[in-house]
Structures are given as C-alpha cells and as structure tokens.
C-alpha cells in the first residue's frame, strides 16, 4: 500500500511519459534523463543471513520445507522471545491530537484515554475507565486545574494517575481520606513523544522496561531540511496481519494504485531477497533498479527506501531518495491504525513556515494518500473474508501455517509477504496478544461492513486528522456563505430597474451557486469517494 515504485532503469523521459513517475513537477523541463545507480550500500546491518529465494515454482511439500529453511533458520538467543506487550506502540501523530480534550484509543484490544497534562506539559495514557463506577474517562473533560475529570460523578485525576478530587466525599473522616486510597487511582501507562509521534507502552507494570528501551525511530533523513515530509493516519477495518501483509508487498502498487502512485504498464519482475530475519523482524532488498530496501521491525514498523540517480537539465546529477515508513498498530481484532510517514528530497512543495503558509496544504496531500488507502480497501476486505472463513473451519486452523497452501506465491515479488507470515507464525504466535477475551463467534468488521462503510473517510480519517477536520469545517462554513450569497444575489436581481445591473446580480448569483456546488463536490474527499478499479483506464 505505502511503497512507490519507480521502475525506469536508465531512460530519457519525455513530457508525455512524465505521468508515469510520481512526484514529477508540472514545470519540469523535458527530456529528462534518469539512471539508476548499481551500487548497493548497506542500509541496515544484521549478522543473520538466509539463502536467496528460488525463482521457480515448487510443489506444496517442498515449498513448506523451503519456506521453513529460508525464513525459519534464524537462531533465537536466550531471552529473545517476542512479547507483544514488551514494545512501544505509536498511537497517534501528536499534531492530530487535541490537547484540550481527552481522546479514546484502543491498543491490543484495551481501551485507553489519551490526554494532555498541562501541569507537567506531557501526554498521558490511562485505562479508559474511572475506578469509581467504571465509566469511560474519554467521555470526560479537563477541569479548571488541568486534571482529567470523569463526566459521571466528577472524580478528577492528575497526570500521575492519582485521584485529586471526589466531590461527593465529606471534608473529614474516612470519606475525606478516600481520595488518597490506591483504589481511587486511575491506571496509567508509560508514554513518550518521539519525532512527532505519541508512543504508549501497553503494560502498566512495565515502567522500568519501558524506560530502558527507545521507541523505533524514523530515519535521520526525516530531520534534514532537504527532505519534504508528509504524515497521515487512518483507522482501517481489517486486521493487523492483513495490513502488514499489504505493506510488505511492493508488487501490488502498479495495479491496486494505478494512476495514483503506480501504473499497470510499469509492472515487472521484482527479485526481492530476504537477507536476515529473527524475532526482531526481517529485512531485505532487490538486485534490480530502482534499488528498494525494506525492513520490518516487530511488531508494527515497516520501512522502505527507494534510491535513484537522476540526471537533470541545468542542475545536473542528483541522488533521489524516497522513504515510506509505516506503523501498523493493532487496535482490536479486525481494526488497525495505519500511520504513514513519507519523505523525499526532490520536487519539494513545502516551505519554511506555519501550515497555512504551505504551497500544498497537508489536507490536500491527504486526498491523494486516501486514494491509496481506498485502492486497497475492498481488495483486502475480500481477501480477509476468505482467510477468516478458513480459520472458522477448525479452532486449531492457522492461516499463517497454511498460507502457502491457501495461496500460490511462485515469484520473488512475494518474498517479503512470506517472510512476514512466517515471522507471525514463528514469533508472533500467529496473532497479537489481545487484552481480555476475543469471542470466536463475534463477527469482525470486514465480514459485515458494506463497501460504503469500508471506504468511509470521515470516521476513519477526517475525525482523527487535525488538518482535514479543520479544512472540512472551513469548507462547510464557506459553502453556507456561498449558498447565502446565491440567495441574496438572486433576490436582489429583481429589484433594480436597470437591465444591466439585473444581469450582473444574476451572474453573481450563478457564480455563487456554481462555487457552492464545486465546494460540495470537493467535500466528498473528506467524507466518501467510491473506488472502482475497472473504471480507471
């Protein structure tokens, strides 16, 4: 989903061909010569290595053996067992959180509330229930003292989780002392802000462990001024494994995202090789051009780097670098948050200054990004339905173990997909370690939601994006103004006796009406756009 493929090896690009390559500026002069460097610099280092994947199909029996040898040869060191709750998880882009209100979030099936403690100037994460009568704290507010207040009975809590006020308690005696009781405290989780991301450690007893481990970081290029960055988050109604398989698969780009970030006529063999793997994840690259390096850092971090050497008129030779980094956070069974951070060092459209000063606003970038999500949505829904149906056949049925029997993956383009499925089976216990029970008879979202609901941008993205939410509200206000202007100009057009003035007023009414309609159509980019692959020629 989140990888952009640029498949020219050494070519002269004409103006008519430029649409085949994403990020090209409309003002670029043509012809444009682009060549790919054959060098293979080591982006990631790990001593574990595996054999290169074969390029010919094998039988089912030999395929299972080959997969086990290829991806299962890593040796676990003592204490290296993977534990789902022993990691930092990014839960949101900080710029998309409102510090004035509590925000609900699910992580590994556990309900949390995220809120900003203005006394300590830190973000906090609590269990989303009040210790009094178990009401959700996310329905509360920040009181006059900057504490999180429950909306049910008004109990308030400080950033450390301790209760600071019980309105119903007497001023003396046992009731007055209740506010100091450990039972009156909210359950708090470790949090950390790093590179614009809010991370949560999903173990309230894991403070020492959390303090000893740094959260996963974006590459250093994201902090360099020569790189232009775009960030987006969206909540998706399919499972963690479905999304991780998708982001591990560069070969779908040219078809699922035709004329968005890829083109069908650019599809070609992708000779990927897994170079190392283990409980930590896996990494690999291709031997072709452009050079694509990929790394999965368990449990949810996927990095892709694309490198090209470009020969441009006037400016000369340039090294083009594209980073696509995604965090795929398991919220609950059948629901995953995708946070994508991308960067490139060419054709930048961002300038120093505040968000309103940008040439291309963030919300407009998200219109394209959401097209990428939409291009995958219904395809992945259908795939997940098949896997879920298979898993219902038997309580012991493991899709990851049977993956090479359920699917046919004869090419090297699927190497990273197989590597992820093998990692999930060998180290991840085939699924995230959810909090609480997960009833097997409860239908998952992808099995019951309609296409309209699956593609609903408003609830999945606009409501959790500060830029798009603000732009949508502005569109609403402007549209109402234009509708009012239409009525006003139309009403006043009949007043003057001068025909020319009447025509001018009628024209203004038509312009206002057309503008209101155009704005209404653009609003759909924040709410819902149908996506039909067969209609994209």
UniProtKB/Swiss-Prot annotation:
Transit peptide location: 1-49
Localization in the cell: Plastid, Chloroplast thylakoid membrane
Basic and acidic residues bias: start-end ranges: 62-77
Regulation: Might be regulated by a phosphorylation/dephosphorylation mechanism.
Keywords linked to the UniProt accession: 2Fe-2S, Chlorophyll catabolism, Chloroplast, Iron, Iron-sulfur, Membrane, Metal-binding, Oxidoreductase, Plastid, Thylakoid, Transit peptide
GO molecular function, one term: metal ion binding
The enzyme's E.C. designation: 1.14.15.17
Region annotation (Disordered) ranges: 51-77
EC class name: oxidoreductase
Domain of life: Eukaryota
One of the protein's GO biological processes: defense response to bacterium
Chain sites annotated for binding [2Fe-2S] cluster: 130, 132, 150, 153
Domain Rieske residues, every copy: 88-200
Function: Catalyzes the key reaction of chlorophyll catabolism, porphyrin macrocycle cleavage of pheophorbide a (pheide a) to a primary fluorescent catabolite (pFCC). Works in a two-step reaction with red chlorophyll catabolite reductase (RCCR). Creates the intermediate RCC through the opening of the porphyrin macrocycle by the introduction of one atom of molecular oxygen at the alpha-methine bridge. Seems to be specific for pheide a. Belongs to the chlorophyll catabolic enzymes (CCEs).
Quaternary structure and partners: Interacts with HCAR, SGR1, RCCR, PPH and the LHCII complex. Part of a SGR1-CCE-LHCII complex, which acts in chlorophyll breakdown.
Protein's name according to its UniProt entry: Pheophorbide a oxygenase, chloroplastic
Gene name for this UniProt entry: PAO
